[in-house]
Amino acid sequence: MAKYFTSSHSKYLLKVHIIFCVKYRKPLLVRFGSQMKSIPLGVAASSDFSIEVMEVDKNHVHMLISYPPTLSVCSIVRRLKQLSTAELWRMYPNYLAKEFWKERTFWSDGYFACSTGDASSETIKKYIEQQG
């Protein structure tokens, strides 16, 4: 049975499967694999959402995120992308300047988001775990 969260005026269970890609689909996540798990987990720890499961492929990241109704999916993605880009540029400025021609970017502009709907969290978790 699903565990619902309760706040002062709502009861909810909101989960979304999010995927975002490296700009130009560059296979850079192989190089940054360990940071690509720790950075988003750190962002989530200081935010109102949580990352239940995450897998990193060579050029994209899959996440299953649980969040309250006060947040939008867009704001979650924006926060994850902005803070991870800033942290990666802080750690690897010379390498990233060569890869992106000094444009301070890392992620492509778009993202994929899908509410989990009728699929169980376990089904989504298994799918994401098989992606890396």
Predicted features, each with a name:
Residues 1-132:
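Basic nucleic-acid-binding interfaces
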